[in-house]
Amino acid sequence: MGIICLIIGLAILMIMCMKGIHIFISVFTTSLFLAVTAWLVSPDMLNPVDALLQVYTGGLGGYFGSFFFIFVLGAIFGKLTAISGAADSVASFIIGKFGERAVIPSLVAACAILAYGGVSVFVALFTVYSMMVSLFRKANLPRRLIPAVYFAGAGTFVMIMPGSPQIQNLIPMKFLGTSATAGLVPGMLTALFQITLVIIYLTWLFKRVKAKGEGWVEDEKTAKAEEGKKDRQLPNVLVALFPMLILLVVLNILKWDPAIALFCAIIAALIVYLRYLDWKKLVPNLAAGTMEGVTSLFNTAVIVGFGALVMTLPAFKESFQAIAQSGLNPLVVTAISVGALVFISGSGSGALSIAMPMIAAMFPATVVDQGSLHRVATMASMSTTPPFNGLIITVFSVCGVSHKEGYGPVGTLTLAIPLLAMMFMLLLYTFLPASIATM
């Protein structure tokens, strides 16, 4: 009964998200439903009030506090690149040098390089967002596809590649004693397979959009911003890129905290963009950037709180145990259990943190190659991303796009294609010689 209630709750949440209902209302309604039904099924569990006030708010508040400066400073940095004309400068350079056809490949490559270089996917979003808006506007592409292009670069093949510094590739190391390049050959072949599918899909998608005559539409906010940009001198492209390079150097070479790296980038931007900023409007613009960051953070934190609540439900634990004890091949068990946890909790890293201790205990090195287990677990954590995933919520919020407008392409890139890639990886481990598969 508890599992049925959990499935109904997830269905309610997905339907409300797709209908465009505000994420907090959607999540709170679903959380209340799950808390009440779980209490009715298992009276010894926390009562609904405590479940919401302790577990849910604990997850929400913990995430809000941990990521506050990353979101706020990231939004301020993005605002500075926009109001200074730096983002427009980079966009004009790309369009001028390579033409409109290079817009999508350039953005996908930029996002992928940032993510594989170790930049948090949240920080990467704020780094490239203003540039993406400028490029989409100049190329007359619809705003609703900005999230799809971002995920194509930062949220698909890069996240599962051997050597990636993203958290999904690092968590299994802690429990399996493996390295970041574990499962090198199957991992790289799967990443190549996924890249191919992403390119094919994006090519088809943008041809279809162009054929339908769909293009950039200014809303009132962006129209006013564009009006103020006319006849404005733009910074040289090297000047425009300098603060972004500072961010990458401080984050990836000096290995400083992401919040400190963003702060350094903001200081660099204020210095090198000095002559391009309207200082009378600077404080209001920074205040607007701050509020945009807080809004995005809150929208993400509410779904993290939901994940924390779901993970305490007896039905959640029963589901995992049933999969883990099914007697299937260890790699298949890992793929199914981690994938199911991701879809239920809405978090790839959260699912890995829960699943890996149990998987490591059930499948030691004497049973299965630990590098193979690592690579399958990482792939599985990115193969069943639900519509209520925290990063998806954040990207839509920052881009000003609703689920109804943008989830179709994003769902293809973060759910359909990764599922195919997961199956491809399992086939590789089935048919490749052991000497190659375990490299």
What are these regions (language model features)?
Residues I3-L6, L10, A38, S42, ...:
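Long, contiguous bundles of hydrophobic transmembrane helices that form the permeation core
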Residues M1-I3, G61-F67, I94-A109, K138-I146, ...:
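Membrane-interfacial loop-to-helix junctions in multi-pass transporters
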Residues A75, S89-A91, F122-L135, S164-L176, ...:
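Re-entrant/interfacial helical elements at transmembrane boundaries that shape
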Residues I70-L73, K97-V133, S326-T366, T378:
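Hydrophobic alpha-helical transmembrane segments of multi-pass integral membrane proteins
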Residues C5-C17, F28-A38, F71-I76, A110-A115, ...:
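Hydrophobic core segments of alpha-helical transmembrane domains in multi-pass membrane transport
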